[in-house]
Amino acid sequence: LYQIRSPLLETVQTSVMVWDLTDDVPVYQFRERLHMRPASTMKCVTAIATLDKLGADYDFKTNLYYTGVIDDSTQVLRGDLYCVGGMDPMLSSSDLIEMARAVRDLGIKTIEGSVYADLSFKDRDRLGEGWCWDDKNPTLSPLLVDGKDEFTYRFSRKLEDMGVTLNGSTGERQLPTDAQLLTTRTHSIRQVLHRMMKVSDNLYAESMFYQLAANGGTRWAGAKTARQYETALFSRIG
């Protein structure tokens, strides 16, 4: 309260409102109708909307598939690997190791094909709307590893480390309908929410936002769809 009465406030913009949620009344107000940038308080809106729509048991998923045929006698996959990104901000090198291990454990030592990243989970926007151009923010790809946009390169290296030889190339391509699921890596919405809210991590918040947009299996989902969910929620609750 002493700081709020400070002469400094005569020359800066400050707006404060403290609300008692139990009694549903304001406890303190200071220039409460002054328009201010909401900044990271909007993460609360995204968190509430996502929990309402997807539930507290929702998982962020990254799926690895294969196509073609595995020759058991030579341990050769005559086909391709596809990794379908689900915009899991917690996907890490350890997940790639387990994915490569799953390939090896399927009895594959050589891949006569390619490794593809399926990025159709979200639109092509690579920066969040309103982000400053000079901020150190990560690329908004649905398939980041340790926050970096280098999945196919790093996964091919992990395959090599596991003794799996890739004789093809790497690239981007959407999953074909005849692909077979090989393994899935997941992180819970609770894990993502913890860092998103405690550290105010923009990547985690954008990832949460796009889970709303892609709800129901929509491909190339855009931010506009997620905003519609948020608008509908707050219209409902007033």
Regions picked out by a protein language model, each given a short descriptive name:
Residues L1-I4, L51, V103, L159, ...:
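Hydrophobic alpha-helix position signal
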Residues L1-T22, P26-H35, E98-G107:
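Beta-lactamase-like hydrolase cores
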Residues T11-Q13, R31-R33, A39-M42, D57-D59, ...:
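Extracytoplasmic
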Residues T22-D23, L34-R37, I70-D71, M87-L91, ...:
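Solvent-exposed loop/turn segments at secondary-structure junctions
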Residues D24, P38-A56, V115, R154-L159, ...:
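Active-site SXXK
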Residues D52-T67, G163-G171:
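Short, well-structured active-site flanking segments
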Residues D59-R124, W131-P138, L144-D146:
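Active-site-adjacent, His/Asp/Glu-enriched structural segments that form or flank metal-binding
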Residues K148-G238:
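A small/polar active-site loop signature that marks catalytic segments
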